[in-house]
């Protein structure tokens, strides 16, 4: 039985996450009151027909905090296993999402959206600390979020339970704050100075071929892959559920994208749970 609670910041993708879980065969309920968890758990753990349940929860309200903790205590006392997925995103991305949907943040009242986001982060900080998986959706599309959840909850992956998130970025836009490991690939020849490659990105085959034709690129990728594979079991041993590997070049469009994709392919081929995203590929 997999009993999953999905919560997090408003606008971080809870609805999309539940849709993804439903596609994976989970019985999903959105906006589920935490106080009813014990009854639902009793029902499903005794059922032979349902073995995967995902509950979407809004935990902003004061009473909900008391309810969720008492309900989690009930699950522990009855040896009911559960997992918590916490979704979050950067302030900038959340503000953009609220503006695009023309929705008001539930905690902003008449104030600014960012004030509501800050208040919600404070209220949810404790539940975030006990989450099994924390997923930053700032740079994830719906399909990438689905892939990340699939890597966690579908069987057959090496070191199931840890997600390897490979990210490319441009140093001119800053190092990703969420990165656990950062690697600088500005030592590689830059496709930017090749006229026909400048308007392309590392997702294009011509740029990929240019970057990976250099011996130093091939050797770097091999050594990087070996190091990551060496480290993963130790991160798992320490209870880490997500490893964010950031690959940086000057603008985040050519070298870092090509190397991030190559690292993703290398790890994916060996059946690790891995996703890739390119933070700055659309920047000018």
UniProtKB/Swiss-Prot annotation:
InterPro entries in alphabetical order: P-loop_NTPase, RapZ-like, RapZ-like_N, RapZ_C
SUPFAM superfamilies hit by this protein: P-loop containing nucleoside triphosphate hydrolases (SSF52540)
Residues engaged in binding ATP: 8-15
Signal peptide: none
Positions contributing to GTP binding: 58-61
One protein family per Pfam: RapZ-like_N
UniProt keyword terms in alphabetical order: ATP-binding, GTP-binding, Nucleotide-binding
GO MF, any single term: ATP binding
Similarity-based family: Belongs to the RapZ-like family.
Function: Displays ATPase and GTPase activities.
PANTHER family xrefs: RNASE ADAPTER PROTEIN RAPZ
Name by which UniProt lists this protein: Nucleotide-binding protein TTE1834
């Amino acid at each position: 039985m997999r009993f999953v609670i999905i919560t997090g910041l408003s606008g971080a993708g809870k609805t999309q996450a539940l849709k993804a879980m439903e596609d994976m065969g989970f019985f999903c309920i959105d906006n589920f009151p935490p106080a009813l968890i014990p009854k639902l758990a009793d029902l499903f753990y005794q059922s032979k027909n349902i073995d995967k349940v995902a509950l979407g929860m809004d935990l902003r309200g004061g009473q909900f905090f008391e309810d969720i903790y008492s309900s989690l205590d009930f699950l522990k006392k009855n040896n009911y296993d559960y997992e918590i997925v916490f979704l979050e995103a950067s302030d900038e991305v959340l503000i953009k999402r609220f503006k695009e949907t023309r929705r008001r943040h539930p905690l902003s009242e008449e104030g600014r959206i960012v004030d509501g986001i800050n208040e919600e982060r404070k209220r949810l900080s404790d539940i975030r600390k006990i989450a099994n998986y924390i997923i930053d959706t700032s740079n994830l599309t719906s399909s990438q979020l689905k892939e990340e959840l699939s890597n966690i909850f579908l069987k057959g992956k090496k070191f199931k339970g840890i997600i390897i998130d490979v990210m490319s970025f441009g140093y001119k836009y800053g190092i990703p704050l969420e990165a656990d490991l950062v690697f600088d690939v500005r030592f590689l020849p830059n496709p930017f100075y090749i006229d026909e490659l400048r308007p392309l990105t590392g997702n294009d085959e011509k740029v990929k071929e240019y970057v990976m034709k250099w011996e130093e690129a091939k050797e770097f990728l091999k050594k990087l892959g070996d190091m990551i594979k060496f480290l993963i079991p130790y991160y798992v041993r320490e209870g880490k559920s997500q490893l964010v590997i950031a690959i940086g070049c000057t603008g985040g469009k050519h070298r870092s994208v090509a190397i991030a994709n190559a690292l993703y392919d290398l790890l994916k081929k060996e059946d690790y749970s891995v996703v890739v995203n390119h933070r700055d590929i659309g920047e000018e």
